[in-house]
């Protein structure tokens, strides 16, 4: 009798394959888009900067003047006891949050909303920023880090600056174990052995005197879980000629 594949074990959802979400700090969203921000601004003080296992960038805890506490993505150069401001009348300063219509063209921005009040959707990874290309009364054009141009509502909010944690990819992992721990923190699947390198008891592509699948790698979408490996329900395989 063969062994269960890794996809079968992960699909069962045992603790070994679940995301350790109980260690995550909080959902990072802007405060509610209320009259304070639409008509003026609200100030807050950075009380702490912490690491969140759920994301690549550090997060800052902010206590606003109305007593509300929120976690925000920390921009570069922010420090504890710094003051930030959110709202239509906030100054153009790193860490402040304003509607796109109030931000000058060419300003680096991050944590951009897709629709007004959704809390932030784009440009949230460490070291990233977007550029505000142009805007008019009906739409604002933002260039994302990928080079894609995004046409957004001018009332969508964004933060001024660059997300902290830049240069993260420049530091090598050095050991496979370090990368394993990084993947484990987010519940990702770490690198595993290829099926053709396994024994026949471990994988449908295993066994034989040399490494080869030994059978067609295209399988039906209705195949049972133990056989659903390779090109699943593929319309075509190989190079397109």
Curated annotation (Swiss-Prot):
Which GO terms of the molecular function aspect are on file? rRNA binding; structural constituent of ribosome
Pfam families (UniProt xref): Ribosomal_L2, Ribosomal_L2_C
Example of a GO cellular component annotation carried by this entry: cytosolic large ribosomal subunit
Is rRNA-binding tagged as a keyword? yes
Give the region (Disordered) as residue ranges.
201-241
**What InterPro entries does its record include?**
NA-bd_OB-fold (IPR012340), Rib_uL2_dom2 (IPR014722), Ribosomal_uL2 (IPR002171), Ribosomal_uL2_arc_euk (IPR023672), Ribosomal_uL2_C (IPR022669), Ribosomal_uL2_dom3 (IPR014726), Ribosomal_uL2_RNA-bd_dom (IPR022666), Translation_prot_SH3-like_sf (IPR008991)
Which of UniProt's keywords are assigned here? Ribonucleoprotein, Ribosomal protein, RNA-binding, rRNA-binding
The alphabetized list of GO BP terms reads: cytoplasmic translation
Function field: One of the primary rRNA binding proteins. Required for association of the 30S and 50S subunits to form the 70S ribosome, for tRNA binding and peptide bond formation. It has been suggested to have peptidyltransferase activity; this is somewhat controversial. Makes several contacts with the 16S rRNA in the 70S ribosome.
- How does this chain assemble? Part of the 50S ribosomal subunit. Forms a bridge to the 30S subunit in the 70S ribosome.
To which protein family does this belong? Belongs to the universal ribosomal protein uL2 family.
Q: What is this protein called?
A: Large ribosomal subunit protein uL2
Q: Which gene encodes it?
A: rpl2
């Amino acid at each position: 009798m063969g062994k269960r594949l890794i996809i079968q074990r992960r699909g069962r959802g045992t603790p070994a394959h679940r995301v350790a979400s109980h260690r995550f700090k909080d959902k990072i969203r802007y405060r509610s888009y209320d009259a304070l921000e639409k008509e003026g601004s609200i100030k807050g003080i950075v009380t702490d900067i912490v690491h969140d296992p759920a994301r690549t960038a550090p997060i800052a805890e902010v206590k606003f003047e109305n007593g509300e506490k929120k976690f925000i993505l920390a921009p570069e150069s922010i420090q504890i006891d710094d003051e930030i401001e959110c709202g239509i009348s906030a100054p153009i300063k790193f860490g402040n949050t304003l509607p796109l219509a109030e931000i000058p063209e060419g300003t680096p921005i991050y944590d951009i909303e897709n629709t007004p009040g959704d809390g932030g959707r784009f440009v949230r990874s460490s070291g990233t920023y977007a550029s505000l290309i142009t805007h008019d009364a009906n739409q604002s054009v933002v260039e994302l880090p990928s080079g894609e141009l995004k046409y957004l509502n001018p009332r969508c909010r964004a933060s001024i600056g660059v997300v902290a944690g830049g240069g993260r990819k420049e530091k090598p992992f050095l050991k496979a174990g370090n990368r394993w721990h990084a993947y484990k923190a987010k519940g990702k699947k770490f690198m595993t052995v290829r099926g053709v390198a396994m024994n026949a008891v471990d994988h449908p592509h295993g066994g034989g005197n040399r490494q080869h699948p030994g059978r067609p790698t295209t399988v039906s979408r209705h195949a049972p879980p133990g056989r659903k490996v390779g090109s699943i329900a593929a319309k075509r395989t190989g190079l397109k000629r």
